């Protein structure tokens, strides 16, 4: 049942790609009275990736942060270096995800029960897609969340 994704890698400036992804959502966030802050702290974050798929993955994370903001979005998108690795992070201060749901969010078609948030559209494919794309590029995805406090999703790539 698993369709193979076509991956066409080229050298990409990840800071620039993440900046472009964030720009796609700037107007939406501003119109909602929120903030979308970008911090690019990773130097020389050049990587061989499929730019279309990786851009879609980052856009998906930002889109989720907006959808589950529970009001005015307050989002931080960043790149960072740590020992031996680069990170791409998307942090929100929204409704958060319960411990139980956190175990399932990367499964295909799983959608977090959102209580009274009936306006959240989607098919439950987003984080499953993000995880697949990141893993196809040799990276990993980590999610940390606290109910009613917000969610942080980090993509990590080991330095090449």
Describe each PLM feature range.
Residues 34, 138-139:
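Conserved glycine-rich
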Residues 8-13, 30, 35-45:
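Conserved catalytic submotifs in the C-terminal HATPase_c
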Residues 65-66:
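Short helix-loop "hinge" at the ATP-lid/N-box region of the Bergerat-fold HATPase_c
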Residues 126, 130:
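Short alpha-helical Gxxx[C/S/T] motif in the catalytic ATP-binding
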Residues 2-7, 46-49:
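Conserved micro-motifs of the catalytic ATP-binding
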Residues 72-84:
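Short beta-strand/loop element within the Bergerat-fold HATPase_c
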Residues 97-109:
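Short conserved segment of the HATPase_c
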């Amino acid at each position: 049942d698993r369709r193979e994704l076509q991956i066409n890698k080229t050298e990409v400036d990840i800071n620039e790609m993440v900046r472009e992804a964030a720009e796609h959502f700037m107007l939406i966030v501003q119109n909602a009275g929120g903030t979308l802050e970008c911090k690019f702290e990773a130097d020389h974050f050049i990587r061989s990736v499929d730019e279309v798929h990786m851009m879609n993955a980052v856009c998906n994370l930002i889109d989720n942060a907006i959808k589950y903001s529970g009001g005015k979005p307050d989002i931080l998108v960043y790149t960072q270096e740590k020992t031996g690795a680069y990170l791409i992070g998307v942090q929100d201060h929204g409704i958060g995800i319960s411990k139980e749901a956190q175990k399932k969010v990367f499964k295909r078609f799983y959608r977090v029960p959102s209580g009274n948030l009936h306006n959240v559209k989607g098919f439950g494919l987003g984080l499953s897609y993000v995880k697949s794309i990141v893993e196809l590029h040799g990276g990993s995805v980590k999610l940390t969340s606290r109910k009613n406090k917000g969610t942080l999703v980090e993509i990590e790539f080991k330095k090449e």
